[in-house]
């Protein structure tokens, strides 16, 4: 959903910004005995996932994806206290910042949980995150001469398995762009020695793109963006009162898929805020953005009865015949009472979402 602009008449003001750069004292880095660090900082493994499908679209349903990334990276083993003699093992620890939900699953978003397994060459080849002190038995010739030794061609963290679990049925799919999953740490030690890991991971796993889909989908406005272009508007709250410049659209809705063959299926809709968020002065309105301050300007949405549709809250579009019909919605710019809005363009972005209830 795209809501645009246009010019609000007022004076423009040029701003000049200045800053001060200060020199901070340098601090020596203290490495732990046996700690492994990646040269140049943690290696980021970017996983691009194909479409992952839940054919039944039922809560608790599982889908498994294997990943194997070709990246290798170089690191350094630190031994500031004493030499680590050859035939030591490399041990790994992995953690995640996602909230736990039990049975080794973590909540990825409101629709999907995830279980993460990294592949390690050792007695436990596919440990589940989180884990600690898992040895890699592939290389038993690792050692370290004071104060450090190179550790080339590391691939740990590059392969494994992701298990997705539906929290609830979804419509149209869920995007996983930019999802940070887990991080891995390493250290070199002999089997009987204590294991301590540094604060910096050697690698991180991030999903750069991926879509989880089902056979159930709703198509809005025949697949085209819903756009409201207000043209030139006034610049005071007297003009920007949520009624002037109002635009009304009649949006076609078509829902199809296995779940929609059940006449008892109940769906609700939600206008989910995008980068412009909600209006700072009233959470019932969409926020706006622009090249100048837009904190006092919002967009109000109303249904055909004139009732306000607050963003990020579920609502009904009325009766749909076999889950097909139309949604009448109006949009209008609204300013904070008593405010004067600076000249320039403005826009708001949001997404219309359907969900089973």
Swiss-Prot record:
Keywords: Fimbrium, Signal
InterPro entries, alphabetized: Adhesion_dom_fimbrial, Adhesion_dom_fimbrial_sf, Adhesion_dom_sf, Bact_Fimbrial_Adh_Pro
Subcellular location: Fimbrium
A single GO BP: cell adhesion involved in single-species biofilm formation
Cellular component GO terms, alphabetical: pilus
First and last residue of the signal peptide: 1-28
Entry keyword annotation includes Protease: no
The keyword Ribonucleoprotein is assigned to this record: no
Predominant subcellular localization, coarse grouping: other
Name recorded for this polypeptide: Putative minor fimbrial subunit PmfE
């Amino acid at each position: 959903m795209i809501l645009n602009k246009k010019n609000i008449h007022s004076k423009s003001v040029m701003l000049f910004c200045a800053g001060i750069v200060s020199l901070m004292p340098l601090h020596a880095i203290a490495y732990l005995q046996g700690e492994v660090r990646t040269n140049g900082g943690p290696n980021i493994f970017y996983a691009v996932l194909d479409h992952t499908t839940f054919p039944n679209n039922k809560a608790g349903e599982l889908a498994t994806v294997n990943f194997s990334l070709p990246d290798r990276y170089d690191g350094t083993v630190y031994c500031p206290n004493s030499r680590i003699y050859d035939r030591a093992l490399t041990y790994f620890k992995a953690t995640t910042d996602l909230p736990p939900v039990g049975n080794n699953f973590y909540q990825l978003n409101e629709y999907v949980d995830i279980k993460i397994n990294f592949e390690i060459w050792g007695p436990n080849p596919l440990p589940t995150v989180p884990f600690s002190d898992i040895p890699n038995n592939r290389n038993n010739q690792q050692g370290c001469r004071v104060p450090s030794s190179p550790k080339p061609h590391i691939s740990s963290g590059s392969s494994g398995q992701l298990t997705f679990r539906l929290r609830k049925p979804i419509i149209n799919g869920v995007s996983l762009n930019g999802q940070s999953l887990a991080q891995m740490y390493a250290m070199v030690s002999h089997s009987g020695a204590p294991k301590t890991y540094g604060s910096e991971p050697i690698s991180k796993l991030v999903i750069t793109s991926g879509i989880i889909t089902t056979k159930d989908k709703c198509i809005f406005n025949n697949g085209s963006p819903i756009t409201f272009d207000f043209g030139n508007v006034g610049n005071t709250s007297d003009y920007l009162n949520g009624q002037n410049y109002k635009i009304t659209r009649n949006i076609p809705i078509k829902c199809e898929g296995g779940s929609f063959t059940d006449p008892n299926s109940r769906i609700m809709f939600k206008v989910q805020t995008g980068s412009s968020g909600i209006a700072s002065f009233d959470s019932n309105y969409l926020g706006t953005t622009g090249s100048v301050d837009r904190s006092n300007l919002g967009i109000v949405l109303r249904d055909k009865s004139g009732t306000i549709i607050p963003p990020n809250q579920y609502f009904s579009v009325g009766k749909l015949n076999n889950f097909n019909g139309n949604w009448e919605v109006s949009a209008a710019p609204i300013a904070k009472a008593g405010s004067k809005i600076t000249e320039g363009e403005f826009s708001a972005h949001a997404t219309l979402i359907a969900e089973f209830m």
